[in-house]
Amino acid sequence: MGFWENNKDSITSGLKSAGKYGYQGTKYVAKTGYKASKKHYNNSKARRERKSGKKNSSDEEYESEDEMEHERKPTDIRSLKDPKSFPPPPLKPGQKTYTGQQQQQMPNGQASYAFQGAYQGQPGAGSMEQSQYAQPQYNQYPQQQLQQGVVPQQPPIYGEQVPPYGSNSNATSYQSLSQQNQPQYAIPSQVSLNSASQQSTGFVSQNLQYGTQSSNPAPSPSFQNGLQCHQQPQYVSHGSTNLGQSQFPSGQQQQPTTQFGQQVLPSPAQPHPQPQQQQQGQPLPPPRGQVILPAPGEPLSNGFGQQQQQQQQQQQQQQQPLNQNNALLPQMNVEGVSGMAAVQPVYGQAMSSTTNMQDSNPSYGASPMQGQPPVGGQPPVPVRMQPQPPQPMQQGNIYPIEPSLDSTSSTPHFEVTPFDPDAPAPKPKIDIPTVDVSSLPPPPTHRDRGAVLHQEPAPSGKIQPNTTSSAASLPAKHSRTTTADNERNSGNKENDESTSKSSILGHYDVDVNIMPPPKPFRHGLDSVPSEHTRKNASERAVPILPPRNNVEPPPPPSRGNFERTESVLSTNAANVQEDPISNFLPPPKPFRHTETKQNQNSKASPVEIKDEVLPGHPSEEDRNVEPSLLPQSKPQSQSQSQFRRAHMETQPIQNFQPPPKPFRRSQSSNSSDSSYTIDGPEANHGRGRGRIAKHHDGDEYNPKSENSTENGRLGDAPNSFIRKRAPTPPAPSRSEKLHEGAITSEVDSSKDANKYEKSIPPVTSSIQAQQSTKKAPPPVVKPKPRNFSLKANEYPKELTREATGQDEVLNSITNELSHIKLRKTNVNLEKLGGSKKVKDSSPVPSDLDEKYVSASGSITPPRPPPSRSSPKKVPPVVPKKNDNLKKKPPVVPKKKPLLKSLEPRPIEMERAYSGDISAADDNLNPFERYKRNVVPQEDDRLHKLK
């Protein structure tokens, strides 16, 4: 039985059960997943619709009601804890005061700003209320007077407030500041400031002091001085009232401390009764805006209870002055609020003018001063608040930070905005002062802008300020330009023209325009000559003059002088145009060049010119005469210049005969064909001059050398030419000298015959140089025949092999060319010496040399040397090559297979054959060079190394 048959039932049942449960499981998972995804989709959809204002009741069912309720129902404010019970939040590291402001309803109906930012100091023992009220003390709005009598004013202040404390809250808040540095100072110790002084003193320093009291109370007085000045004017009217006096525990309302600034601050150690006495001693009412800084001498132990009692008593006493002050306050509030509100925006300084501080507040503002002086033990310096009119402060203060102050509102106003985490961080608003545009000067305009600029120059020098002058002068200019417009509208056409002219002349400013108008006037003055010159200039395409002439009306007086100058300019312009005409004179110059090319070529070799050209160049003198004529021809008519050109052309033709150049060329070509068969002066001119003139110094040339005949210059030329023919081939340096001195030799020959100078150097060099150029580069070929030595015979064996290998590459044409060159060179070589030919000639090398010559195709003697130092051997071989080369070109292919079978060619053979070393190196295969000799040696060397 098979395995399947035995287990078939169990296997099938297992598969069925597995499939069944698997299906159920997958179905369940699919359902749950579908439900979950659907629910999630519905929830998200409901949220999206909720945001868009749509609602789906069916979708909302899936959403958790808790979340919905939580999202929908904001917490009731009444259920929240009173923020007053919370301590103030910590200040940021660079923050001195809180920027938030409150409007506190004064019982008088005046709202006061409370800078609550100043909770820096921790409330001292028993100073909790004081610290609480420290913030409300920054009632920038002139609360000062009201706070004394009103307890509820300060409750809006955040922090722990002790509502029972009435006006004391101000004092306590003041104490809180002092407590921060010196909690022991009680308000009673402070000198109560008159309500006006308190208001005026609503020290900015107080605001600052919240941030700084603990650390730097001392600088506060200075701040008070500077800041108070802004705040003081608001409270000036109240200077007479004495609200702060009630603060003192003595209950005595000290008469206005006549010298708020003058009063000497008692040392902090002194108990408060002393400052009271001092103040009492001072009968004079305090000047408006001046503040007396109370000396913080009393410890807080005085307690709020005493102060409260005292203040409560005082409130009754002070209600009368308060009522009086209240009558003044609405005005003060109106003025002071606007001014102080402007001060408030300053966050760093707590500019929120706490000038509004109630009686305790001014002393409170002074507390920082008090904090420091007690430390030093020295009496604090009194700070005087200078009265200032409140209105100027209003003007200067632009910041509209005033919260809507309702002097009539009876309840504190709280503005609370819910925290929005998504909202961007608030940034301090930059208040841009509004500026009256009419008061600003007109913006500068580009000088090229036509309207204003044309207007300004229109008046004849009346408008002096430059358009580019400072912006301060611009308004005046603007008005002037308007007047200029009126003038132009009045009908000054000439002014319009002058302005347009000035702009044409280059955008002159008003001052500059005085000068430019005369220029156009000068144009227009001399109508007759200027018109002629203008016509000439216009014909001659002088661009600037014609527009000026067209634009200008002719006022005679000023234009007369300038028109003369203009006529001169036109004549100059005509001359300038003649300059290109004179430049056109070069056509005769090219004729001169054709005639005087010999002279110019001689000039090309300055050394020869020194010796030879000077006698032989009347043509140059003629040239010198010509340039003198050229400048003269500029003012003259072109016909005269052309006539002179023709005359000049005739002069160089007379002095120099151009025909010999082609004649010499014909000789050079004939000489190349005839190979030194040239006779007579022509041959002498052809070869000898080129050889003679290598360097104007004839000493360099030996009598044997071609150039040596330069010694016989001019008259000796024919004889020297004969001598030169024989020595020409052997000297390698001579051939180079011939190339170098070819131009110079022309100069030398110019002494005898000026005509032949130019043509001679190419002719002399043409025998060798031209032939060399045909078959091989002349510099390479020339040294080879001259430098041949006995070594050349040694190399030719390899050379012939190489040459034969390359003869295949060389065509029969190259062989023929090499034969031709050999013929020409053979003449020279034979003249040089036939003995060398005998020595050099050898049966085997001669064949090799012939093949080699065909391969190399060199003009110079046969064997293009692997070593170029064997010139002597080559020349004797050359004549044989001449005869043999004609017969032996078929022999070369025979040697080719032999040479191929032989060892590879050396690189030098390649170079000699190709004439270009770089090309030969590129064509060579290094393995071919070394394969027979070097490769087996390297194998042996490797074996040895092993």
Curated annotation (Swiss-Prot):
Membrane topology type: Peripheral membrane protein
InterPro entries for this protein: Aim3 (IPR031370)
Region Disordered, annotated ranges: 1-333, 351-903
Phosphoserine modified-residue sites: S57, S58, S64, S473
Compositionally biased intervals (Polar residues): 166-244, 351-364, 463-472, 762-773
Sorted UniProt keywords: Membrane, Phosphoprotein
Pfam families: AIM3
Biased composition (Basic residues): 36-54, 887-898
Subcellular location, record wording: Membrane raft
Cystines in this chain: none
Keyword Membrane: yes
Residues that bear Phosphothreonine: T728, T860
Basic and acidic residues bias spans: 69-84, 485-499, 523-538, 608-625, 748-758
Subunit details: Interacts with RVS167.
Family: Belongs to the AIM3 family.
Protein name: Altered inheritance of mitochondria protein 3
Annotated organism of origin: Saccharomyces cerevisiae (strain Lalvin EC1118 / Prise de mousse) (Baker's yeast)
Gene: AIM3
